[in-house]
């Protein structure tokens, strides 16, 4: 009932809302790793290599200002280059868009960019609110259903009141 819906780019959203202590989850169009992959069509303007470079600079700035950023992407050499300053975990995933069931397995990464100028305090294990069950999971292209527990684990030591999925489409 108190929701605010803005139609802004991720840069405009960050400029308007990001503040020290925030947890920011980013699920941008992935860097293509296969011959037939083309995830830049998710937006009208496209999302190209230069956009990924700008996004990585934004993640570094957010971390420097005291935000904790969790970012997902494909397991691509470019991701390791762009986010070399941060921890990167590889996660086995399923793809439902390949006509060949044997080729539906993949690997994504979770980039963990903690706040750089804040003391980290463990407040205990995070429990997902019951509200999350009210939303259907996305069972399409970029579903993060299989990553929710890893994301919850990665953020369990941080206290926050809200989460913004800047590249929404995950259903949570």
Q: Positions of the model-derived regions?
A:
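Class I S-adenosyl-L-methionine-dependent methyltransferase catalytic core
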Residues: 1-172
């Amino acid at each position: 009932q108190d929701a605010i819906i803005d139609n802004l780019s991720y840069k405009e959203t960050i400029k308007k809302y990001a503040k020290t202590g925030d947890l920011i989850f980013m699920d941008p169009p992935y860097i293509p790793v296969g011959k037939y992959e083309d995830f830049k069509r998710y937006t009208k303007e496209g999302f190209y290599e230069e956009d990924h470079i700008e996004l990585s600079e934004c993640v570094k700035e957010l971390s420097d200002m005291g935000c904790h950023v969790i970012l997902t992407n494909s397991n691509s050499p470019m991701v390791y280059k762009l986010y070399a300053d941060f921890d990167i975990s590889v996660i086995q995933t399923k793809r439902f868009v390949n006509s060949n069931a044997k080729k539906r397995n993949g690997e994504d990464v979770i980039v963990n960019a903690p706040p750089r100028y804040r003391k980290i305090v463990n407040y205990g294990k995070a429990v997902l609110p019951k509200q999350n069950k009210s939303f259907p999971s996305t069972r399409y292209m970029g579903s993060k259903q299989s990553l929710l527990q890893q994301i919850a684990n990665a953020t369990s030591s941080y206290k926050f009141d809200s989460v913004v999925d800047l590249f929404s489409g995950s259903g949570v």
